[in-house]
Amino acid sequence: TAGYEDEPSHTVTTVIVPHNAKSGQLVNYLAYIDSNGAQCAPSYSMRQGSKFLNDDLLNYQQLLFSTFLNEGWILTIPDYQGPQRAFAAGRLEGRMSLDGIRAALNFGEIGLEKNTSVVTYGYSGGAIASGWTAALQASYAPEINAIGFAMGGTPANVTSTVQSLDKGVFSGLCVAGITGIIYAYQVVQDWFQNHLYPKGNDAIEYARSHCITDIFSRYPFSHVFSDDFFRNGSSILYDPTIQSVISDIVLGLKESETPKAPVYMFHSQHDEIVPFSDARKTSHNWAKHGADVFFQEFSDLPIGHALSEITNIPNSLFFVRDRFAGKPFPKGYTRKVTGNGLEEPNASLAGLGELVRAIQDIQGREVGPADSELKQFILDRN
């Protein structure tokens, strides 16, 4: 793959082929990593024996990708932050994601054709990658047969996201985001060398070796943008060097970066982590530039960042299912407000069943034919 400045780079993608795999259908699943430790990448955290198999965030995400596997869809789950573990560096993440799709299509043993239909899904930090996959696909990987992009709780503007998180319970995300941007851009890394105070340097070093739950617990209610962490800490986001980078990773600003396939976005109006207004602005800009966008808002007060995804599993599933089925998608811009994802008429019963099955998956429900294929293989050999 390639870094932000087109320098050669590399990463890993994990491909999961279900027992009932459907040919010609691939889901590009972008897990939220939201941290900078090498061990936090999906290719590490999903390995048998990894302590992160007991991690709540990973198990929570398995709700959805287990559901996708039950549908028979092959998954590619890339380490889209790359070797620099560059969380929040959207353009780089988009490239890594697209090259992960290319790798899956090119790996003959999986049996995917070059014209395989691909749908991308990402939530929260994964939505940064999903959004930039959508924005860059037409120019960076036009040969990919992308038929849909789904994203929720989308941090469309990194600047306003970290500003809203600073001094709050999730301020550790500020540390992780800054660390990711530093290691994605050499110009930012050079700039920070002259602006780091010991506390800031310690925070970045900690983030580079830990995952998000540890970062959350170490830096709650921290005033990251202060002179405790950085020289002129309150104004670093407005420094010309930093501005030149972060202003270029705002989703939806450039008409040339408009998704060519249908886009489904969902977001709580009361999201306490990612600003709702930024995602809505991106949806408007994309539609203004010619994209077909369905933007779903959740108005129930208890539906914040975490509950938005879990209650919307049925609608996310139906979006992917409908894209593979070739069903029509609304043209232009569509906005829909519901209390929560389960209030959709088509999600109330069928969707609730999917949600129950998804929860059963992470509680240990058996998926697939167990060892029947292995037994048959042994019989055949004998």
UniProtKB/Swiss-Prot annotation:
Entry keyword set: Disulfide bond, Glycoprotein, Hydrolase, Lipid degradation, Lipid metabolism, Secreted, Virulence
Up-regulation conditions: Constitutively expressed regardless of pH conditions or exposure time.
Swiss-Prot/TrEMBL catalytic activity: a triacylglycerol + H2O = a diacylglycerol + a fatty acid + H(+); a monoacylglycerol + H2O = glycerol + a fatty acid + H(+); a diacylglycerol + H2O = a monoacylglycerol + a fatty acid + H(+)
Disulfide bond residue pairs: C40-C211
Compartment annotation: Secreted
BP term (GO), one: lipid catabolic process
Glycosylation site list: N115, N157, N232, N346
Top enzyme category: hydrolase
Positions of the catalytic residues: S124, D271, H305
UniProt similarity note: Belongs to the AB hydrolase superfamily. Lipase family. Class Lip subfamily.
Name of protein: Secreted triacylglycerol lipase LIP5
Source organism per UniProt: Malassezia furfur
Lineage, top ranks: Eukaryota, Fungi, Dikarya, Basidiomycota, Ustilaginomycotina
Gene name in the database record: LIP5
